[in-house]
Amino acid sequence: VFTEGDSFMKKDYIIATKKISTLGSFAGKSNTFSKDEIKDLKAQPFTKGVGAFTPSLFKVSAGLGMQEAGIRLSTEMFFESVPDEYVDVSLDKWHFDEDTRIIPIIVPRNYLNLYNFGFAQSRSLPKLSEGLMSLVQMDIMMRGNGRVEQYKGNIVGFSNRLNTILVPQSFMDWANKNFAPEKEAEPSRLIVEVKNPTDTAITDYFQQKNYETEGNNLD
C-alpha cells in the first residue's frame, strides 16, 4: 500500500471548500456546508456522489517514536474522516476495532517529506522511507467529555491530494459520540465524485457558489 501512489482517492474526486475571506472571518461567517447546500450539490448533473469530511470534535495529541533510531516526536493533531467508499485502501486494513485499540491512519505524504528534509536533516536523525513508517509507533491520546484515553495509531497509507490526517468513519463516529457527545460535526469540506472532471459546468457552479477546490484541480 505504501508504494502504490495515493491511498486516499481516485482522479474523479474533487475536494470542495468554501472560499474564506478576511471580512467573512471577522464577521463570524461560517465556512461549513449546510444540509441544503450538500443536497443542491448532489442534485447537479455533473455529480455522481457527495461525501462529507467529518472533523474530530475532541482534543487529540500524538507521540511518534522509533526506539531503535532514537526518534521521539510529540504534537497536537486533528483528525478527519470520509465515508469508506472514498478511501482507496483495502478495507481489511481500514477498520477500527475498539477491542484492539488500534486506529488505522492515512497521512499526507508531505508530512514525511517535511520530517525527512527538515526535521531529520537539521537534527542528524535518520530519514524514514514510506515502508519504514509502518514500523513507527503512534501513541494517540484523546481527551473530551471528562475522559482521557490512549490508543495506538497504525499508518496504513499516504496521500498526495489530502492535507489532513484521515481515520476510518467508524472510528470517528464512535470517538465523537464518546468524547464530544454534546457537539455536532459540521463539514467544512466535501468530497465530490464527478462524471467528468473537465466538465466546465463544475467550474461555473463552483464560481457561482463561491466554492473552491483543494489543489485547484478545476483550473
List each language-model region with its residue ranges.
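Membrane-proximal extracellular/periplasmic loop immediately following the first transmembrane helix
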Residues: F2-E76
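Conserved short beta-strand edge segments in small beta-sheet-based binding/regulatory domains
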Residues: E212-L218
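Pocket-edge structural micro-motifs
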Residues: T17-K18, S81, R109, G215
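Basic-flanked hydrophobic alpha-helices used for secretion and membrane insertion
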Residues: F33, G49, F58-A62, V87-S90, ...
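Alpha-helical transmembrane helix bundles of large polytopic membrane transport and channel proteins
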Residues: G65-R72, E76, D84-D99
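Short hydrophobic beta-strand that contains or immediately precedes a catalytic carboxylate
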Residues: E76-E80, I105-V107
